[in-house]
UniProtKB/Swiss-Prot annotation:
Gene3D superfamilies: Tobacco mosaic virus-like, coat protein (1.20.120.70). It comes from Cucumber green mottle mosaic virus (strain watermelon W). The keyword Zinc does not apply. This is Capsid protein. Belongs to the virgaviridae capsid protein family. It is found in: Virion. The modification N-acetylalanine is found at A2. Keywords: Acetylation, Capsid protein, Helical capsid protein, Virion. SUPFAM superfamilies: TMV-like viral coat proteins. Pfam families: TMV_coat (PF00721). Capsid protein self-assembles to form rod-shaped virions about 18 nm in diameter with a central canal enclosing the viral genomic RNA.
Length: 161
């Protein structure tokens, strides 16, 4: 039993890029209260978000029969997901100073602005992700997955001699 036909352009569909929709939405809604002002808050959020995707389908393992899954490598969700991860990846870039032991007032103010910008960007991308998923972009069940990627599940056949 396997999916057919498989071409290089379809291999991304079989990657560990799926999250159950309810799990992802619950995580995103709960994350709206996250303290993105601290590096620890951004790190914790990014690590938790990065741990959500998993592999639910393989060339030899059929897409789950029940439930809806967000495909984070899809054409709509991928740029939002990557932007969200990037907005939380500010370690060692928030404060860029000439003399690290004695930052100037301007350098400190710039660091605060960068932190605020990262927080604003993260919150905006969380909202964008929730909205896109709610509209059904890159969200699949078995039938829509097989139709979207033009693959057919072929049952094993036995030959009679």
């Amino acid at each position: 039993m396997a999916y057919n036909p498989i071409t290089p352009s379809k291999l991304i569909a079989f990657s560990a890029s799926y999250v159950p929709v309810r799990t992802l939405l619950n995580f995103l809604v709960a994350s709206q209260g996250t303290a993105f002002q601290t590096q620890a808050g951004r790190d914790s959020f990014r690590e938790s978000l990065s741990a959500l995707p998993s592999s639910v389908v393989d060339i030899n393992s059929r897409f789950p029969d029940a439930g809806f899954y967000a495909f984070l490598n899809g054409p709509v969700l991928r740029p939002i997901f990557v932007s969200l991860l990037s907005s939380t990846d500010t370690r060692n870039r928030v404060i860029e100073v000439v003399d690290p032991s004695n930052p100037t007032t301007a350098e400190s103010l710039n660091a605060v602005k960068r932190t605020d910008d990262a927080s604003t960007a993260a919150r905006a991308e969380i909202d964008n992700l929730i909205e896109s998923i709610s509209k059904g972009f890159d969200v699949y069940d078995r039938a829509s997955f097989e139709a979207a990627f033009s693959v057919v599940w072929s049952e094993a056949t036995t030959s009679k001699a």
